[in-house]
Amino acid sequence: MLMLRKIVFFFFLFVGLSLFAQQDYMVSSYVRGNFYNRGRISTESLRASDDLIFLNVHPNKDGSLSFENPRAFQGKGVTTWEGLIKSVRAKVKGTKVKIRLGASSGEWKAMVADEAARTTFAKNIKTVLEKNKLDGIDLDFEWAENEKEYKDYSLAIVKMREVLGDQYLF
């Protein structure tokens, strides 16, 4: 009986380790301009990432976009959002680059509740992706508190996929 237990134990151990060893993983890094400008994000850390996610793009109520100033909190370094992307890309090659669409600020609830604003927003995001040769978006929504907000958020996701198509990471 003891021998059978050992065989079963090692069988499950072998299967478990085999499955664990086959798992793929991905390392993502969020890049915030004010941290990058202050040297708080090392180039080595960025090079170790599979994809870089740039913060922060916010919607206005009508679906137009606002971008975080990368020089917030200090007066040095890159001065524009596009400059931040170019600066990082010059140092880090071969990673996927996305923009984060999160709910930390902006008029998300009003924008996703309006069909025309959702369409405008999705088209504006596509323009940003094309202009900056980005690979996709990272959705980071954590604020939906009721059924209507979940529905509106879902409609915004569907609209994003419809406008962006399959060529962008989502």
Annotate each predicted stretch with a short phrase.
Residues 1-22:
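Bacterial Sec-dependent N-terminal signal peptides
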Residues 11, 56, 141-143:
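Residues that line or immediately flank small-molecule/substrate-binding pockets and catalytic motifs
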Residues 71, 75, 148, 166-168:
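Short acidic, glycine/proline-enriched helix-loop-strand junctions
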Residues 111-115, 147-152:
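Short, solvent-exposed loop/turn segments at secondary-structure boundaries
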Residues 125-150:
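Active-site groove signature of glycoside hydrolases
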Residues 150-170:
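Active-site neighborhood of glycoside hydrolase catalytic domains
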